[in-house]
Amino acid sequence: MEKIEFQTKLILIIIIIIYIFLHYLTNSYSKVPDQSDEPYHLNQTLLYVNNYWKSYNKQLTTFPLTFILTSIYLKLRRHGIGINKKDITNKIYRKEYQIYLSDGRVCSIILSLITIFIFSLMIKNNNLLLITFFTFPIKFIYSFLIYTENTSILFMILYYYFEEYKKVNNKFLLFFIGLLSVLSRQLNIIWINFFPLMNCLEILFYKKINFNILFDNIFDILKKYIHIALIDSLFIIFFFINKCSFVIGEKNEHIPKIHFAQIIHFLFYLLWHFPFLNFKLYEMFKNKDKKKKRQWIKNSIILFLLLNFFSLFTITRRNIFEHPKHYNRYYYLGIYYKRINRIIMLIYLSFLYGSFITDYLKLFKKVKFISWIICNLLSFCIEGLVEPRYFINGIYMLMILINDDNEKESKELSYYLYDNYVNFIFQSLQDIYMVHNLVTKLFNAYVY
């Protein structure tokens, strides 16, 4: 096992302390947000705790691996055992509710800590990237709640660790971890195919585009990734048995659709969660290289035209507007569906990311980054629902890729991905519903 430096160990200890503190905060009060899926997740977990394996909530869309793992933890803790199925379905267990919820969240924290530890082994003591990984806002919030993201990210990172970092040849182990990754979230089927895709593109782009070389090597690729081919086959069988749907429940709400507007939402999402990205635009304005500036303007105009074209493929779920507390509602009504605001946003995004294209075009011409772009597009451009959680896998994979790359551009780009603690404090913590309640109660207690 790789040696972990003292600074990295210290950061890991601080992370554990932060998780313990935030777990205390989130469990100080029993109130759960109106838009939270946690009650559904807890109910399903309690059904498994009491061996009701055939019951599955129709509102849950993912495979049940997260709830199975959480139920195992609750059983070991002797919590939730002996509750009647009818009581679980009707939520008639309010007296012990907070105990079950709290222990289920502990399981999520354990999964998150394992993920962070594995990531720390892979990044070779790149503490900047480790802090970014930990503080990444949308994932950070779900790290101590009962959500599928914790299991999904864990097995995706674990699969990458064994497949590419440790170069394990045990196909059964890789098949097992890859399967667990897909069983935690269906869209992970795209990300475990990242490596076969990269291999195919490396052969295809060898010296020049040559499909004959690719076809000649296709059986070698299948042999190398036979475990992935088997998982893909099982997933295809599931897809057709499941009436051509990727999800378990709410099939009508998650019909695969071409949704290129997700690219716009993804770019805006990056801008919102990584405020340092904005400095790149400032640097480009200050740059005195006229040739580079002309290239930047050219790239920005092309990007603006593309983003406008993508906006034609906008899909909006009606229930977003029916729920006044849904965060996407404010984005749609306040920015995206107001023509002037949307144009201003697209112009800004175009010039900002145009500067990145100008500086890092050499980097993103590499096969692994082309593969990353393809997997990203596949993972969220077939989904009608705009959900920031769907972007997490792509961001984490990008962190891994730039860490593995020794190019000057990669090292520089890693600094732009650094999500500083100012953003962590003022953005992430404000989204945690318990903090507001705690501050209000403390203020009332001491002032009044």
Predicted regions and their residues:
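Extracytoplasmic catalytic/substrate-binding loops of multi-pass membrane glycan-assembly enzymes
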Residues: 29-44, 56-85, 368, 390, ...
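Juxtamembrane segments of multi-pass membrane glycosylation machinery
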Residues: 49-58, 69-107, 144
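Membrane-lumen/periplasm interface segments of specific transmembrane helices
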Residues: 181-332, 430-447
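Short acidic/glycine- and proline-prone juxtamembrane loop motifs at membrane-interface regions
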Residues: 141-152, 187, 387-391
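Transmembrane-helix motifs of polytopic, lipid-linked glycan transferases
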Residues: 102-126
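Membrane-interface alpha helices of multi-pass inner-membrane proteins
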Residues: 130-131, 135-140, 157, 162, ...
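Start-transfer (signal-anchor) and selected internal transmembrane alpha helices
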Residues: 1-26, 124, 294-301, 363-365
